[in-house]
Amino acid sequence: MIDKEARKLETLEKLLGIPRQWYSQMSRGELPSITMPTRTKRNIEYDEDTEVWKYGDRERLREAGSEKSALHILKMAYVIWFIRHQIKESRSSTLRELYYISEGWKKAKFAAQNDSNLLIEDLEILTDVQREQFNLRPEEDGASIFGPLRIREETRRGSKDIHCGDDVGEAGYQIPTNVEKLEFLEHDAEMVIAIETGGMYARLIENGFDEKYNAILVHLKGQPARSTRRVLNRLAKEFELPVTVFTDGDPWSYRIYASVAYGSIKSAHISEILATPSARFIGVQPSDIRDYDLPSDKLTEQDVSALKSELTDPRFATDYWTEQINLQLSLNLKSEQQAFAARGLDFVTDEYLPARLSSMGVLRR
């Protein structure tokens, strides 16, 4: 792993390169400015080398020639100053705390937390450094992981080796916000299953699915945090394990899968370390709703609109997704993971998952 002090110095050097650029611009009689990629669906392109979606060539120049742009650059200067101080003092803060700290910055204070969050993303893009290296973290923690995986966690009190099955309770090991502090030591796994809901995650653990099939189980906790996606990315890359995603059968859950496999518009600048392009979708598939006659609900207008939007989303531009989404629109139904319980509490682990994983070529027994 990279030396902590070297990483700190590298982060500071990249961060301070921004105000140095402004100083050079003003020394030449120019207005200070920054150039950023436009963060829209139209500027997302597929990178064949990395197999993830990234920002394209469309850029936006923000120059201090208007009050709005000048204020943005002023706020960025304050945030850089704050992060510099935080790194030097080996302190950390949440994104929420940063927003409240800005209350004392007079004209540079943020009107809403979303504004400060977006500015941090700007700094990530400009420096090619993750916010975790700025010692900034979100309010929410990463989710949980359970199964045959041994890790080493670096903390303020030193390092500690943890087995994510033997050394934790049935809630699993809680993924920290900064996954770079983890070293993956060894495993006895044949697959990774990322699970949307806590109920299904607990069902697989209670039924011993992790032991029977040597599976690492990861609770996504809904739309997964960056730390959770980073863990999946590392498990796929470092151990070359097949990663699968098991969600509810609705358009919002398909987007959870897409964020794991291909990345999102919001984090397209770090798709290479967050996305897992080899990740495959288990279900709940629209065809499962039909074939297993699962208890279901009618699609809402918002569901229908979201499904139609996904038909034009480049992340779903495959024959498989086109067929499944059109089938769901035809069925006009959606189902939850827990709907399999209608066939018994063991059905999902004894019948559905083994059959589905075998058909995908993930399970070979």
Where are these regions (language model features)?
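Nucleic-acid enzyme cleavage-core boundary/entry regions
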Residues: 1-242, 251-365
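Glycine-rich phosphate-binding loop
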Residues: 248
